Amino acid sequence: MEDYIKIEKIGEGTYGVVYKGRHRTTGQIVAMKKIRLESEEEGVPSTAIREISLLKELRHPNIVSLQDVLMQDSRLYLIFEFLSMDLKKYLDSIPPGQFMDSSLVKSYLYQILQGIVFCHSRRVLHRDLKPQNLLIDDKGTIKLADFGLARAFGIPIRVYTHEVVTLWYRSPEVLLGSARYSTPVDIWSIGTIFAELATKKPLFHGDSEIDQLFRIFRALGTPNNEVWPEVESLQDYKNTFPKWKPGSLASHVKNLDENGLDLLSKMLVYDPAKRISGKMALKHPYFDDLDNQIKKM
């Protein structure tokens, strides 16, 4: 830790305090995440350290790079590249009545998908994607932060400040208690973020797991074994769920064109096996008119 100087506290993440810091010799500005674990006495589990060490190898222009993993007083510090703005702050800064430029929505979505495809190809899931952990710079680049931390540390129910971890971007298979889930959980999250890029509003903003599920069901219809084989046997599925009929996504997401809505609907398919993959999403006609500079990144 002696290599880094803490400059100021910049936020509170899912796992602990985040500081802006500086490397003593190079002067490089970094983000320092202090990981606060549930069981402080036992120190950091070796499995977590193994998992985290693997993340140093995830090098991609759309992934926030993990530069160092340090221990101090049995606390774990993760040293990341520094970006000052996250997508939530950016969306909140857009004046009322105005929206993000549609070409920027497209560019950000494409970059998010590129980052996710890279990680999925290395068998790393994110599991907790949300606007707060998508970081942006002033050159139009967006990067995914906190990759792989969910697997290393688990996703707590509450942030250590007692703020509840958001459910708004969580996939239906996770909400319904599926024990086996894979890369489609991240695609669902990206779909909900895509809608929010277009409208500035969360697509499904539930305040409990059941409220979250019912908001999804009201928009997309209550799933059954016909549309999603075996959904009725998932741990938290109840036959007593109200049977809503599918509505139209267009009524919830007014600022997307036909191709955008088509891609969104493919990302929000109930059956994870039928949900579009990141790789296929990148080939969708929605991106046909995207600037080639972005496609080459």
Swiss-Prot record:
Gene3D superfamilies: Phosphorylase Kinase, domain 1, Transferase(Phosphotransferase) domain 1
Entry annotated with the keyword Transferase: yes
GO cellular component, one term: spindle microtubule
Residues reported in the UniProt entry to bind ATP: I10, G11, E12, G13, T14, Y15, G16, V17, V18, K33
Regulation of activity: Phosphorylation at Thr-14 or Tyr-15 inactivates the enzyme, while phosphorylation at Thr-161 activates it. Activated through a multistep process; binding to cyclin-B is required for relocation of cyclin-kinase complexes to the nucleus, activated by CAK/CDK7-mediated phosphorylation on Thr-161, and CDC25-mediated dephosphorylation of inhibitory phosphorylation on Thr-14 and Tyr-15. Activity is restricted during S-phase in an ATR-dependent manner to prevent premature entry into G2.
Per UniProt, location of the Glycyl lysine isopeptide (Lys-Gly) (interchain with G-Cter in SUMO2) cross-link in this chain: K6, K9, K20, K139
Positions of modified residues (Phosphoserine): S39, S178, S248
Protein transport keyword on record: no
Residue positions where N6-acetyllysine is found in the record: K6, K9
PROSITE patterns assigned: PROTEIN_KINASE_ATP (PS00107), PROTEIN_KINASE_DOM (PS50011), PROTEIN_KINASE_ST (PS00108)
Source domain of life: Eukaryota
Summary of the function given for this chain in its UniProt record: Plays a key role in the control of the eukaryotic cell cycle by modulating the centrosome cycle as well as mitotic onset; promotes G2-M transition via association with multiple interphase cyclins.
Name this protein carries in UniProt: Cyclin-dependent kinase 1
